[in-house]
Amino acid sequence: MSIDDKYYILRFNAFKAHHDIKEGGMNLNQKRQLIKLLEQYGKVFITTEKEIDPEFERYRIPIKPYEMHNFLAFSQMLVSDSQTMSSEAAVLGIPSFRCNTFAGRLSILEEEEKRYGLTYGYLPRQFEWMLEAIERVLQDTEAKAKWEIKRNRMLEDKIDVTAFWIWFIDNYPESVKEVKAKDFDFGRFK
């Protein structure tokens, strides 16, 4: 691969955690449709928590887990049935689409979607709508720049968590009392 190659990441969740009971994501046919669409625009890579379907083995990401965020940061898009990686892509300014039964129910992803337009969630029965939305972004030559603007807007609204924790630890135990005060100003950590 060269630095100029366009690539897309698919992330498939195992849905084996206790909170995943009766939850699910994309089926095999939907995954096939997704790959067929994305391959028209560049390379497709798959990362998965579960055993990869044999027909998708050739798409497996050939990287170590600790390299994932760097790989994600330079991708064109993430399509997933995983909440965590969808949010991570959003924070990196990478267009992300997720399709699972959690869509519309998780506050952080809802904020990233409704307030900032960084990620989009669809139920499995809305898969065709998701494909249409993905295609619109794929055809938008300014998508990367637009997502960078959205990302910067989101980051401007948030505090610097590292600065907060450094202050909190350096000033412990008084910092606990300050944070619990009704008039505590988190804005000073922007």
Segments (PLM) and residue ranges:
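Nucleotide-activated sugar donor-binding and catalytic core shared by glycosyltransferases
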Residues: 1-41, 51-190
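Short internal beta-strands
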Residues: 45-48
